[in-house]
């Protein structure tokens, strides 16, 4: 939330390690910009900066707020064509809203990602004030659409473990949003119910900020 494609680039410090390991990093923006939708910049947790990696169905957002289609059907294929990367070894990870996106997109597009991980993700968006606000705005009262973009609900509906190689989630215990917005325990329970291996690592003293992100 509130971030751009530059936030991770300038604050996370991941480039050095990625260069050492031969990993290409792709940092997409978090929402459309410059669309001129009325009210798009009135709130920090909705509209600009809060795309939530979904395709909106409610007007006036439906035309431009199509982040899932942009990422999965435009940006990733274009990246694979333009750069010498191994498309069979693409992983996805994200922080907070980006963690929500990593988990939901990976489940909504089975087999697309070789690894899936998240840092302090919004893991049960329907239970979070952030998620309720965004889903109401982008989907209206279509609860079925809400459920299709809630990581815990999606996991609970899996007939078999979708990621047999396992999932990795890091979460700071001093995170001010942990109990109200993030709900990692709900996602962990959903994983347990479908026997999805997940490694949920809690870290004392770490909050929701970029010191946490740059550490793990």
For the regions a language model picked out, list residue spans one by one:
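Non-catalytic cap/lid and distal C-terminal segments of serine-dependent acyl enzymes
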Residues: 1-216
